[in-house]
Regions:
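Alpha-helical membrane-inserting segments
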Residues: 17, 21, 49, 95, ...
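Aromatic-anchored segments of alpha-helical transmembrane domains
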Residues: 16-20, 91-98, 159-168
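Membrane-embedded catalytic cores of phosphoryl/pyrophosphoryl-handling enzymes
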Residues: 69, 112-225
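Hydrophobic alpha-helical transmembrane segments of integral membrane proteins
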Residues: 83-113
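Short juxtamembrane and helix-loop transition motifs at transmembrane-helix boundaries
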Residues: 44-56, 88, 92, 112-117, ...
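Interfacial segments of alpha-helical transmembrane regions
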Residues: 3-12, 69-93
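N-terminal transmembrane-helix/juxtamembrane module of multi-pass inner/ER membrane proteins
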Residues: 1-63, 101-113
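Hydrophobic alpha-helical transmembrane segments
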Residues: 57-77, 132-134, 140
């Protein structure tokens, strides 16, 4: 069932991404971008909301991600969970650079609230957020036994991903199609990464919290008793 769901997600994400890329490369105007501009840029922007969106956008910056990696290592003794998340992050960054160089889509002009450089498609922040926090959600789903903690963490990670994507549109540094494409690419990537690469770090059925944990040695008194 898990493999079937993974396949469906990957295929749907691939179809959406290919459609978006086709339209962008053909120079066609996408209605989604116009709708998102009207909704997010025209109607949502408020002086008090702008610093909030800037802070949300920073959840995909290196300093925050490094802190998150340290947290993964702290809460999951043994380095493999943190290394797993770190390798995922590095490979996604490389993939984003490659895709941007292929598409060469300029960033939006005229309504940016912050300065950004580089190409626009797909959104790097959106790709990073989906790949990194998405993998953390996957880890929690597979290895956390407490249902409340599991659903709380997964809801939190999902909210972060959506909020980061929305913040990039709000700040005027990406089109909605950049964000959607970034999400789709990372969903495809996570389907591959969790199937092929994650087992190298976290074998199926292994609790990350138990990785490299030494077995308890009973005391002489307990053996005598």
């Amino acid at each position: 069932v898990r493999d079937n769901l993974r396949t469906i997600i990957v295929v749907v994400a691939a179809l959406i991404f290919m459609r978006l890329a086709q339209e962008i490369l053909a120079g066609e105007a996408v209605k989604l971008d116009s709708w998102a501009y009207e909704l997010v840029v025209v109607y949502m922007r408020r002086p008090w909301l702008t610093p909030v969106m800037q802070s949300i956008s920073e959840l995909a910056l290196p300093v925050v991600l490094i802190v998150m990696l340290l947290a993964v290592e702290a809460f999951a003794p043994g380095r493999r969970p943190a290394i797993c998340a770190g390798v995922n992050l590095v490979l996604v960054l490389v993939l984003n650079v490659v895709l941007k160089q292929i598409v060469h889509r300029p960033r939006p002009e005229g309504f940016r609230l912050i300065a950004e450089t580089g190409y626009s498609f797909p959104s790097g922040h959106s790709m990073i957020a989906m790949a990194f926090y998405g993998l953390l959600a996957w880890m929690v789903w597979h290895y956390e036994r407490d249902r409340f903690v599991k659903y709380l963490c997964m809801s939190g990670f999902t909210l972060v991903v959506v909020a980061v994507g929305l913040s990039r549109i709000y700040l005027g540094v990406h089109y909605a199609t950049d964000v959607l494409a970034g999400f789709c690419v990372s969903l495809m990537w996570l389907g591959l990464y969790t199937k092929i690469f994650v087992p190298l770090f976290l074998p199926d059925g292994t609790d990350p919290q138990a990785v490299d944990r030494k077995p308890e040695v009973s005391s002489p008194s307990s053996r005598a008793g």
